[in-house]
Design a protein with these regions (language model features):
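Contiguous mid-protein beta-loop-alpha structural module that forms a pocket-lining wall or clamp
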Residues: 1-3
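Negatively charged, low-complexity tracts enriched in Asp/Glu with abundant Ser/Thr
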Residues: 5-61
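Short aromatic-glycine-(Arg/Gly/Cys) micro-motifs in beta-strand/loop hairpins
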Residues: 9-12, 20, 76-96
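Short, solvent-exposed secondary-structure boundary motifs
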Residues: 40-45, 66-72
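Short linear motifs in intrinsically disordered
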Residues: 50-56, 73-84
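Secondary-structure transition/turn motif
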Residues: 64-69, 92-96
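Short amphipathic beta-strand/extended segments with alternating polar/hydrophobic composition
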Residues: 72-80, 98-105
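Mixed-charge, glycine-accented linear interaction segment located at domain edges/termini
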Residues: 90-120
Length: 122
């Protein structure tokens, strides 16, 4: 027996390598494009003027403001931990109430799309 060549799993077996989890959650390009498209149309309608994004280990958040000094009028949150439960997307209203949850970003943004149509009609 040779010293220093100990292989606990045996030759030819692959051992799992303990990796680190993601440092932060982010938006994928198509998701961000969809959100920014809505944001641009809301700016053109005069509803929103500013936005902020926050990326943490648990969630990615996009918040839209009428004025920078106010609380956000809408907040879109991506939380992958909820993917298999109620859906990883959540739309929050101005007072923090949940307006919509779901698995599909387009469906979650639907209340804001309807609000945009009302703003354009006025």
């Amino acid at each position: 027996m040779k010293t220093g060549t100990h292989t606990p799993a045996g030759p030819g077996q692959v051992l799992p390598f303990p990796g680190r989890g993601a440092d932060q959650i982010g938006f994928e390009r198509p998701e961000l494009m969809r959100i920014l498209d809505l944001y641009g149309r809301m700016v053109a309608a005069g509803e929103w003027r500013d936005y902020a994004m926050d990326f943490t280990r648990q969630a990615a958040t996009f918040a839209a403001f009428r004025r920078a000094a106010e609380r956000p009028q809408a907040r879109i949150e991506k939380c992958p931990a909820l993917r298999n439960k109620q859906g990883m997307w959540t739309l929050f209203g101005e007072h923090g109430q949940v307006l919509k949850r779901g698995h599909d970003l387009a469906n979650v943004l639907a209340p804001m799309e309807r609000r945009l149509l009302k703003a354009v009609e006025e």
